[in-house]
Amino acid sequence: MSDLKTISLFDTFVYQAELPKYLEDKNFINACNEHTDKAIADAEPTIAAREKKLEKSIGDHGMSYHSQAELYKDERLADFELLIRNTSRNILQEQGFELTNYFLDYTEMWIQKFATQGGGHQDTHVHWDNHISGFYFVECSDKTSKPIFHDPRQGRMMLNLPIKDHSKLCPAMERQIFTVKPGTLLLFNSWLPHQFSVDNGIDPFRFIHFNLQAKKLTI
């Protein structure tokens, strides 16, 4: 049919940028390392208790180290957190949201490192009560875990058909795997389901994860 028009409705976006400059900032990296080291130290009792229960030395296999969730308060990350905050607000405005009576604030930001002995991963999830979420990759390679985004329309899962070519992004695709490198930034709406594939523990895998919420200025 020659006059058939395609009208895109309810689009889903992931926003990507390459920002290696932060990895060249000694203060930024020192902050990342300090928070990571503390998270690893804090997990030692958990690892010991797990090994005692299982009666087997398995180290940190399958674990994921999380720092405290107020990383955005570290002054060494001030430029980074402001960039994320402003960019997130711009994204919501460009999507058509009226934010005159709202300000965007972090609910959490933490640095996360997958187990050195492999098995680190994250199951599919969303970040409820938030509006923009994202990742900034500090350490990764083509051998490490990858972020995977899933179609948020759960209803279509019942009637999905085979996909012609999984290597091509198309409306039929039910999930998309992203290839990232150190310095990659990904931003997306917090309702978008996402996960991280199982990491084999070959190379270090570490990233900053954050969530922001639009809060009313007045009630």
Question: Can you name each region flagged by the protein language model?
Answer:
Residues S167-I219:
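Catalytic core of Fe(II)/2-oxoglutarate
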Residues M109-I111, G134-Y136, I208-L212:
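A structural signal for short, well-ordered beta-strand segments
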Residues M1-Q95:
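Non-heme Fe(II)/2-oxoglutarate
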Residues E75-T107, A115-H131, V138-S145:
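Active-site region of the double-stranded beta-helix
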Residues Y22, S141, Q154, L192-H194, ...:
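Short, solvent-exposed loop/turn segments at secondary-structure junctions
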Residues N27, T144-K146, M157-L159, V198, ...:
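Short acidic, gly/pro-rich beta-turn/loop elements at beta-sheet edges
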Residues Q112-L185:
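Catalytic core of non-heme Fe(II) oxygenases with the double-stranded beta-helix
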Residues D11-F13, D105, N130-I132, P204-R206:
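Residues at beta-strand starts and edge strands
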